[in-house]
Amino acid sequence: MSETLSLSSVKAHLSELVDRVEGEHERVVVTRNGRPAAVIISHED
């Protein structure tokens, strides 16, 4: 599953997001100024 979050939201919740990405193999698309800028995925993916 993939979730899209703004960079400011990722900054505020980074530890929680890393736990979720690692444990549930979720992908997080990070946006900057409303445009996709990066993806956070687990090391195993």
Specify the residue positions occupied by each region the protein language model found.
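Bateman/CBS regulatory modules and CBS-like beta-alpha motifs in cytosolic regions of diverse proteins
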Residues: 1-21
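Short, charge-rich, low-complexity interaction segments located
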Residues: 20, 27-45
